[in-house]
Amino acid sequence: MKYLAATVEMADAIYNILHTTIRAVYPKYYPKEVTDFFCRHHSREHILEGIASGNMGVLTDRELIIGTGCYDGNHITGVYVLPDYQKQGCGSKIMDCLETEISKKYDTVLLDASLSAVCFYEHRGYKTVGHGIYKLQNDVKLVYEIMKKKLAAI
């Protein structure tokens, strides 16, 4: 597996990873409105902005793009792995790469964790430092954990 900087040519594959993963995983934890919100949020425009920032990468298995990660400053803004590749170390590989990049400028990292990912981040040493609630249509609420980790100096 290799973690590479994302390019514009990879945007469709990244879009597929995000939407496939959201549609497969999030309904187990959230109502339909939250799943729909995440799919709208992860639009092609949003993906192209992440690529343009230089802070978005992809995880490949041979030639297949199977995961993606992105950060802004010391905030990890997204980690997604195709469902067929989950629980195989792919998310950890992406996190290792993101944390390494962030540790070049910061000693702590923050992220907003969906309910489906909290245990994964806890196993990586993240601690919940707050709770977020984002109000959606039909009085539905998106609930998430605000998590933080102290990074080792490189």
Feature map (PLM): residue ranges:
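A short beta-loop-alpha structural element at the N-terminal edge
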Residues: M1-N16
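Conserved GNAT-fold acetyl-CoA-binding loop/helix
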Residues: H19-E45
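Conserved beta-hairpin
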Residues: S53-G67
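Conserved acetyl-CoA binding element of GNAT-fold acetyltransferases
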Residues: D72-D84, D112
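Conserved acetyl-CoA pyrophosphate-binding loop and the N-cap/start of the following alpha-helix
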Residues: D84-Y85, G89-C97
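C-terminal "cap" of GNAT-fold acetyltransferases
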Residues: D107, L111-V118, Y134-I154
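Conserved active-site tyrosine of GNAT-family acetyltransferases
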Residues: Y121, Y126
